[in-house]
């Protein structure tokens, strides 16, 4: 039956009587379907490409799991539940971070930034070195602390990686009172050299982020063992959904206690 149908379709489509209305309608219909199908394939290919691009960008700088406090602003990394998470076999990289707003100044230019203090194992969590556009991602060489700036921040400040001049970071003294007689004492400041710039093609990072060592961030913002978030990377064999359920159960039990 299918063979007969194909023969009939072939005869009407390629009949020598090309002036036939049936032939004309058939050709127009076939062309219309072909063009529509081709356009759909191209569109899906483009969307698939965008999905892969966005996914790869997020995987370069975002953690798989991010733990933030339900109440308040910080978590204590020495709390029993937090220390327990760090020991789980499913956790490949355990990274406490501090994220706070600050003012960044370079020569006669300044702009607000989101300072992110990270420990030495941050490259194992984020692979940020893969999106570095200039310099080398390095936060400490054993003697000097460094900052890595989003490419938008660096551009607006007019600073480049490995500049001989440091940027200055200022944040309000979180624990002290405002000194009206000498307002400068109400701020904590750090002079720090730029080791690299990075581009994630996401404004939330490129135009705001300044990454510094966790120890320096804790000094600037008057923290000791606290972190504003815990970022995790899981082992390749770990089911992310199952891990999230396990994590929620632990944290809920801890909060209830």
Give residue spans per PLM region:
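Mechanotransmission and gating elements of multispan inner-membrane complexes involved in transport
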Residues: 171-177, 181-254
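Short acidic/glycine-enriched loop/turn elements at secondary-structure junctions
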Residues: 101-193, 219-221
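A general structural signal for well-ordered alpha-helical segments in protein cores
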Residues: 6, 21-24, 125, 240, ...
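Envelope-exposed proteins and targeting segments
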Residues: 61-63, 90, 109-113, 145, ...
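N-terminal Sec/SRP start-transfer signal
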Residues: 1-37
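Hydrophobic, regular-secondary-structure patches
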Residues: 44-114, 120-143
